[in-house]
Amino acid sequence: DGSGTRETFEGRALDKGTAAAGANVVNSNGAMKTAIAQDPNAIGYVGIGHLDSSIQGVSIDGMVPSQENAANGTYKITRLLYMNTKGEPAGLTKAFVDYIYSPDGQKFTSASGYIPKGRD
């Protein structure tokens, strides 16, 4: 299937069920956002980083989808994204990883709609 967002939604919101046979299934947040925005009767899902004024987020258990609510765990349908390297990063890879964890990189991550995390 190829969509981690869909896998998360199906596993957490559909109680491990699947979409109806006639559902318009798409393979990216961008395609889902476009499909929702173009159909006034559409119901779909996108990552929090893709929410904007073209679509309306849905509250779950009274909590709106936001960076803050996802970060503090009160919005329950979330997933983590990871950066992985083969061994210790070096050269440009290390520079990129260092940037992502720098104050500027954390600001960029947040401005892009994602939740910055420090190094563990």
Language-model segment annotations:
Residues 1-120:
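Exported/periplasmic ABC-transporter solute-binding proteins
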